[in-house]
A protein has these predicted regions:
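Viral structural modules
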Residues: 1-167
Length: 167
């Protein structure tokens, strides 16, 4: 998938730099985590809805005056939904995928839902740009365990300049 104009939720110090910089360019994007949720489709017993959310650490360089570029870091997220055909399983399945205090704060395992597996490569950065904040944009929910992967609090308010990335 080509994912266009993902908002990057910068750390506080990175946001302060972005607000006063002349420009910024994304250097790289690293996949931090992929959240997978499998739920049955109500109208068909053999179909399942797979919800995926990808969490990326974004590293960028900001141009401030004539000095060397200043490093920025933040989080970008992308969600995708797919409906797949699968069969109910009668076997009891025990896997290491059970997570206590997972990214959604819950630990859920169902013996009757199929197991979804996602293979993902780190993305290639195609472009980036800066825009003024949109006051009506819905701010995504960021799980606390993802926020904990950053040294500072992530800025989710809409009033600032925003860094966008295309992966």
């Amino acid at each position: 998938d080509c994912i266009e104009d993902l908002r990057v939720y910068l750390t506080k110090s990175s946001q302060n730099i972005l607000d006063s910089c002349a420009g910024a360019k994304v250097r790289c994007a690293d996949l931090l985590y992929t959240y997978i949720d499998v739920e049955p489709v109500a109208f068909d017993r053999n179909h399942y809805c797979i919800d995926l959310t990808f969490y990326y650490r974004i590293l960028a360089d900001a141009t401030v005056g004539v000095n060397r570029p200043v490093a920025l870091q933040g989080l970008a997220m992308f969600s995708k939904r797919a409906v797949l055909c699968g069969e109910d399983s009668r076997a009891h399945i025990y896997t290491s995928r059970t997570r206590l205090d997972g990214s959604d704060g819950l630990s859920r395992v169902s013996a009757t839902h199929p197991t979804a597996v996602v293979e993902v490569l780190d993305p290639m950065v195609l472009s980036s740009k800066i825009r003024q904040g949109h006051c009506h944009e819905q701010v995504a929910q960021i799980p606390p365990c993802i926020c904990g992967l950053f040294d500072e609090e992530l800025v989710t308010s809409d009033g600032n300049r925003q860094l966008l990335v295309t992966l």
